[in-house]
C-alpha cells in the first residue's frame, strides 16, 4: 500500500522530532555534566554524527522510494537535508566556540586551512550551505538545469564527511568505519548514474 500525502505529513512531523529531540537531549546532557572529561570533543562528535546521520538518511530516500514503490517519500528528502545542514552548523559552531573559544575566533580561518580534516569539513559545510540556500522550488525554477548540477555535489559531501570523521578521531573505532561503509554503499547504488555523467 502506498503512503498518502497525509501520512507523509505525519512522517515529516516525526522527522522534525528526530532532528529536534537530540538537540534538547544534548542541552540537557551538557547542563547535567553527562559527558566525559572532554565535553567539547563529545559535543563536537555528537553534532557531527547527527549531521552525518541526516545526510545518509537523505541519500537513502531515493533507493527506498524506488524499491518500496513509495514515490511520495521523495517529499521528505529536502527536510532531511535541512536538518543535516542544521546539525552541521551546530557542529561547526561547537568547534569554533568550545574548541577555540570565543576569544580566539580569529584563528578559525587558519585552523581550517592548516588542518586537512578541518578543510574537508568546511568544504562540506559550504556545499551544504549552497544546497540549503537553493533548496526551494523558486530556486529550482530560477536555476533550471544548473540546479541539478549544483545539488549533485551532495555526493561529494557524502565522500568528504566520512573521511573527515575518520581523520578526526585519534583512535579508530567501529563507528566512523560503519558510517563510511554506509556512505559507500549509498554511493555504489548510484553507480550507473555516475557512469552516465562520466561519458
UniProtKB/Swiss-Prot annotation:
Which biological process terms from the Gene Ontology are attached to this UniProt entry?
Answer: protein repair
- Top-rank lineage group of the source organism: Bacteria
Names of required cofactors: FMN; heme b
Q: How does it sit in the membrane?
A: Multi-pass membrane protein
Q: A Pfam family matched by this chain, by name?
A: Ferric_reduct
Q: Which GO terms describe its molecular function?
A: electron transfer activity; FMN binding; heme binding; metal ion binding; oxidoreductase activity, acting on diphenols and related substances as donors
Q: How is the cofactor bound?
A: Binds 1 FMN per subunit. Binds 1 heme b (iron(II)-protoporphyrin IX) group per subunit.
List the InterPro entries hit by this protein, alphabetically. Fe3_Rdtase_TM_dom, MsrQ-like
Q: Where in the cell is it found?
A: Cell inner membrane
Coiled-coil stretches: none
Q: How far does the signal peptide extend, from start to end residue? A: none
Q: Name one GO cellular component term.
A: plasma membrane
UniProt KW keywords: Cell inner membrane, Cell membrane, Electron transport, Flavoprotein, FMN, Heme, Iron, Membrane, Metal-binding, Transmembrane, Transmembrane helix, Transport
Residue ranges annotated as transmembrane are 8-28, 82-102, 116-136, 149-169, 171-191
What role does this protein play?
A: Part of the MsrPQ system that repairs oxidized periplasmic proteins containing methionine sulfoxide residues (Met-O), using respiratory chain electrons. Thus protects these proteins from oxidative-stress damage caused by reactive species of oxygen and chlorine generated by the host defense mechanisms. MsrPQ is essential for the maintenance of envelope integrity under bleach stress, rescuing a wide series of structurally unrelated periplasmic proteins from methionine oxidation.
Family of the protein in this entry:
Belongs to the MsrQ family.
Assembly and interaction partners: Heterodimer of a catalytic subunit (MsrP) and a heme-binding subunit (MsrQ).
Task: Write the protein's name.
Answer: Protein-methionine-sulfoxide reductase heme-binding subunit MsrQ
Q: Which gene encodes it?
A: msrQ
